[in-house]
A protein has these predicted regions:
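Cytoplasmic-side transmembrane-helix entry/capping segments in multi-pass membrane proteins
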Residues: 1, 53-63, 107-120, 136-142, ...
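Loop-to-transmembrane-helix transition segments
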Residues: 1-2, 48-73, 135-142, 193-222
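Hydrophobic/small/kink-forming positions within alpha-helical transmembrane segments
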Residues: 5-13, 40, 62, 66-70, ...
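Transmembrane alpha-helical segments that form core, pore/gating elements
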Residues: 13-16, 24, 39, 132-195, ...
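Structural signature of hydrophobic alpha-helical transmembrane segments
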Residues: 20-35, 74-91, 133-146, 205-218, ...
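Helix-helix packing/entry segments at the starts of transmembrane helices
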Residues: 30, 85-90, 157-173, 221-255
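C-terminal transmembrane-helix exit sites in multi-pass transporters
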Residues: 91-113, 248-267
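Hydrophobic transmembrane alpha-helices of multi-pass small-molecule transport proteins
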Residues: 110-127, 265-282
Length: 284
């Protein structure tokens, strides 16, 4: 799991490097398109056995996952890598809230404490001492919420859909939606705040950019494989705790790429979110 966390942080660093040449929407497209073909190949050779039957939930999983990813890549491009990764890691806190309201799961006292701790962590990172937070930090938090919504949806369909079909819903939407936005981009006069959604597809990149794209796709696949392997070999609560080590890894990679080192308030916020995530993991 520690290796998975390191690889995940490296994947974030590669994405940040690519933001100099690719838009956030292009990153989402290239992140998913290869996976679609791989999953389709496996489904052709080993058809799924589960019946499914709730396509709307399958689509919602894909939509929430796509929304989380586009916001994640946007925040990687606009704020320090460590902060972007940390805000994305608020998803376990949001999962607890969604599970309580939508799935009627019990919320223990430890989980409630974790939510409060995590909330204060968000406050310290975004530093809204002037009663406002930056647009980029807000989208980072929203990305964490969408990731949580995707995880909550998986809980509803994991017993009726093959895992590969669930993955395909995410990667399929993550491939189709960018194509739609690419087609609309020349005809939409979007506000500056939404420019990351309607960036035009370039298609012509230097060779080194293609190398980084291919490397990112491989690293992403390796990270998912290591994560799956870790969950199959250890308790989910332990894995959840160790997964937060990708935050210090990300801070280190971000610093090497030119990010400013986190100040006292940011470090405090990161620590509180990690603590909140650990408490949530231990409460399960």
């Amino acid at each position: 799991m520690l290796l998975s966390a390191l690889v995940s942080a490296l994947n974030g660093a590669l994405a940040k490097i690519l933001t100099d040449d690719l838009s956030s929407m292009e990153l989402v497209f290239f992140r998913n398109v290869l996976g679609v073909f791989i999953i389709l190949y496996t489904l052709k050779h080993t058809p799924p056995t589960l019946t499914g039957g709730k396509f709307h939930l399958l689509f919602m999983r894909g939509f929430f996952g796509f929304s989380a990813m586009i916001l994640f890549f946007y925040t990687i491009a606009t704020i320090p890598l460590g902060e972007a990764i940390t805000l994305n890691k608020t998803s376990p806190l949001f999962v607890s809230i969604l599970a309580f309201y939508l799935l009627k799961e019990h919320l223990s006292k430890r989980a409630i404490l974790a939510l409060l701790v995590g909330f204060f962590g968000i406050i310290f990172i975004t530093k809204p001492f002037g009663m406002s937070i930056s647009y980029e930090h807000f989208l980072g938090i929203l990305g964490g919420f969408f990731a949580a919504a995707a995880y909550a949806t998986i809980k509803k369909i994991k017993d009726i859909y093959d895992t590969r079909v669930i993955m395909l819903s995410f990667m399929g939407v993550g491939t189709l939606f960018p194509i739609i936005f690419f087609m609309l981009a020349p005809y939409v006069n979007e506000p500056e705040s939404l420019s990351f959604l309607f960036a035009e597809f370039q298609g012509e990149y230097e060779f080194k950019v293609w190398v980084f794209i291919g490397f990112m796709a491989l690293i992403s696949t390796l990270s998912q494989w290591l994560l799956t392997k870790a969950y199959s070999m250890s308790k989910a609560s332990i894995i959840g705790v160790i997964s937060y080590t990708n935050i210090p890894f990300s801070i280190g990679f971000g610093w090497m790429l030119g990010d400013a080192f986190p100040d006292f308030w940011t470090f405090t916020g990161i620590g509180l979110i990690i603590l909140g995530g650990i408490l949530v993991s231990k409460s399960k």
